[in-house]
């Protein structure tokens, strides 16, 4: 009798990718907010542009990094875990920097 090699559930890494990609669900809200940034008198034109670009582009960056980490996890799991952790720290660092108005 042949032993089946099917996963029994989600691995810790799969949960990590799911949590890493969770902010993608807020993308419609980001698209709604981004045109209203122009109305904020405290932001310079450069800050408004950078915030708009961040709000429009972050889901693509998260999805690209998640896909890369998933593919790397098949061959080099420790490296993939490190990449996912470092990417999460970098994303949330940028998020707080942008949300704080670049101060």
UniProtKB/Swiss-Prot annotation:
Coiled coil: none annotated. It is found in: Cell membrane. InterPro entries: DUF5389 (IPR035333). It is a multi-pass membrane protein. GO terms for cellular component: plasma membrane. Keywords: Cell membrane, Membrane, Transmembrane, Transmembrane helix. The lineage of its organism: Bacteria, Pseudomonadati, Pseudomonadota, Gammaproteobacteria, Pasteurellales. It holds the Pfam family DUF5389. It comes from Pasteurella multocida (strain Pm70). The keyword Transmembrane applies. The chain crosses the membrane at residues 12-34, 49-66, 79-101. This is Uncharacterized protein PM1437.
């Amino acid at each position: 009798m042949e032993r089946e090699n099917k996963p029994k559930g989600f691995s810790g890494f799969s949960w990590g990718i799911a949590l890493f990609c969770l902010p993608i669900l807020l993308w419609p809200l980001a698209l709604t907010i981004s045109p209203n940034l122009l109305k904020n008198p405290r932001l310079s034109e450069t800050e408004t542009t950078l915030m708009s670009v961040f709000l429009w582009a972050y889901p693509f960056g998260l999805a690209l990094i998640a896909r890369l980490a998933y593919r790397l996890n098949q061959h080099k799991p420790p490296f993939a875990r490190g990449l996912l952790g470092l990417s999460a720290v970098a994303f949330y660092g940028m998020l707080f920097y942008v949300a704080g108005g670049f101060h």
